[in-house]
Amino acid sequence: MRNRVGGSRRQAWSLAVAFVVFTGALTGTAQATPVGPVDLGTLPGDDNSTVLAVNEAGVMVGLSMSGPNPQRKRPVRWDASGQIMALPTPGGTEGQVRDINTHGVSVGYVLTATDAVPTRWDAAGLATTLQVPPGYHNATASAISDTGVAIGNWLTPDNQFHGFRWDPDGQATDLGVLPGETWSMAEGISGDGQIIAGSAMRAGANHAVRWVNGGPITELAPQSWSSGAGRINKAGVTAGSMVETRSGPPIPATWDRDGTIHRLDWPSPHSVWLYHIGSTGYVVGTGYLNAPRRNAVLWDPDGRLTVLADDNLGAEVEAVDAYGTAAGSFQRQATVWYRDGQRTQLGQLPGGSRGQAYRITDSGRVVGTADTSTGKTHAVFWTLR
């Protein structure tokens, strides 16, 4: 799940805007008690595991790991009940799986003795090596659409870093760079595979770009001094930020499917980072509203800002669902923040002391990690509804 579409959006934005602070008090209908965590375990002989992606059916992909130095990472898949399966690594013994689509098809890469090789695994876990043009190398696939279009990044024959895409039939396309430049990165893709979000260099600064229907690279904020917008939901709405002048304040924003920009409330001259955009347009991130303290924050589909309750102790937010439920951590415990103002810390594994939530689905599954009684870190999931 890397996952909007909102109704009306405000056309004007002001640094003087008011924002809401969640106190953690229950202000609406009580939420169901979360169930879990369910320990997803590791492959035999491994120590730790983590979930990197989950689809709406609850199928999860991630890593099973062993050894501190060097650490061996193996791609794995868990079915919705939590049964683990090793994904094959043709030509190597290690690799990573980075994303999974609605149909259970996942992508990542396998590490061979000399190279990173992009790989796709079908819903049954069978591996296919994705072809790379002659001279291109160290290619890693990082996201896949529901239509089977995969994206990632590779090194060109002259060792330049470029974004690329693979069509469902395996045809590879270099996505190119901005005129006169040498670097680009593909970071996310819409559910229909038509819009790819990423970054590229121009005049020594990073710039948010996108590719539509495999077309040429275009800038999302061409008048800005710098920008970045690598978060995209299934509807093709992109989230990121920009700086209009070298010394100007950061401006968080979303871009509609047609490229129309909407500035999000941010009454601060200090840094802000956007981490995830949900399927209906909620956005989460962190930033310094009142430096030096950093806040976990949420924007609704109209761009209104909410500071997530942290009792002035700090919190991290990673993801948000269609209903505005945010997932992350507070006081080293996996935590969700509901739109009615309730903050709920999720359960721990027996004997464990900490946890972290990384993703949340619209169907109510939260995935993350939690410590075991022996100090290992295991992939886990909780159920909200």
Residues covered by each model-derived region:
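Secretory targeting and sorting signals
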Residues: 2-32
